[in-house]
């Protein structure tokens, strides 16, 4: 098992993180006794990677950039929109964009060595593209991995999150999420806001890495709108340095209405209405969480996400 985030800051505004093996922990009866059962997520050991060679437009330098995707070992050369390969359920914040004819990339998740294999290094950095009279954007890009996929290329500067398809079908009820992680914080007491559409600002409060795991019971109406009840919730924030790698960290999944639970935090664990998925018609629609499921309900989808930057 390998693990989640090594997050620190350098060169003004950069954060880094590492992540690898993620598994779900279930309790299965065995000869009348409860027995732990660890169920790995496909490619969740982070030992296999697809490396994409994307050639950016000459007007912004014409550089060849490497984009890393979690999936079967493979190299892809050319500006080809990426679709998940080999049955990989993993999406990343690495994307190819083509805005007003200009090809630009963002890579904030990297393949990184750990022991005899690999892990994922998640980085938050400032990404900028400027072409006189055409485009002028500077934005803080967080490193993230999630279960789902991204529709490429990104073609506009607004509502890019609609290209993301959050979550994958899942009907089990895991007891916990387990992985290894390593954390080193920036030490800065405040965050920055840099959206690409306004001046650089400051946000009170320390930055942190965060992992969320949501189980949802989704429903689609005749018009293709999707609502969901929250079945299970697990959220953990990392705001302190770890003492090297922490192996086998295990976090309990809470079921049903957790608003009275001592660990409940509305900002990070509350019902959401900002994630997108594709409906049965192939349209990108907002997932509207309308309430908490009963404590014994089964989900239809799961959404694990890890970020190197707190985005609420």
PLM regions and their residue ranges:
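Aromatic (Trp/Tyr/Phe) and Gly/Pro-enriched flexible surface segments
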Residues: 35-174, 178, 204-303, 310
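Solvent-exposed strand-to-loop "edge" motifs in beta-rich extracellular domains
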Residues: 180-186
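Beta-strand acidic-aromatic groove motif in beta-rich domains, primarily in extracellular
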Residues: 188-196, 206-213
């Amino acid at each position: 098992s390998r693990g989640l985030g090594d997050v620190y800051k350098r060169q003004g505004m950069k954060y880094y993180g590492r992540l690898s093996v993620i598994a779900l922990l279930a309790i299965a009866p065995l000869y009348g006794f409860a027995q732990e059962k660890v169920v790995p997520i496909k490619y969740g050991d982070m030992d296999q990677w697809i490396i994409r060679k994307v050639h950016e437009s000459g007007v912004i330098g014409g550089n060849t950039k490497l984009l890393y995707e979690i999936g079967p070992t493979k190299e892809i050369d050319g500006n080809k929109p990426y679709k998940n390969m080999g049955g990989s359920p993993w999406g990343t914040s690495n994307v190819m964009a083509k805005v007003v004819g200009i090809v630009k990339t963002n890579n904030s998740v990297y393949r990184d060595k750990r022991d005899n294999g690999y892990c994922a290094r998640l980085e938050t950095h400032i990404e900028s593209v400027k072409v006189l009279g055409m485009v002028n954007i500077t934005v803080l890009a967080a490193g993230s991995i999630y279960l789902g996929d991204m529709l490429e290329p990104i073609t506009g500067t607004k509502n890019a999150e609609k290209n993301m398809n959050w979550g994958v079908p899942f009907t089990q009820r895991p007891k916990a999420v387990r992985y290894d992680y390593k954390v080193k914080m920036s030490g800065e007491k405040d965050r920055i806001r840099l959206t690409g559409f306004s001046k650089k600002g400051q946000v009170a409060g320390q930055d942190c890495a965060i992992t969320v795991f949501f189980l949802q019971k989704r429903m689609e109406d005749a018009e293709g709108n999707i609502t969901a009840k929250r079945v299970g919730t697990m959220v953990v924030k990392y705001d302190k340095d770890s003492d090297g790698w922490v192996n086998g960290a295990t976090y309990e999944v809470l079921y049903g209405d957790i608003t009275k639970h001592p660990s409940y935090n509305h900002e990070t664990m509350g019902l959401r209405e900002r994630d997108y998925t594709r409906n049965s018609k192939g349209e990108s629609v907002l997932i509207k969480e309308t309430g908490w499921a009963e404590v014994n309900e089964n989900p239809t989808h799961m959404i694990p996400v890890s970020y190197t930057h707190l985005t609420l």
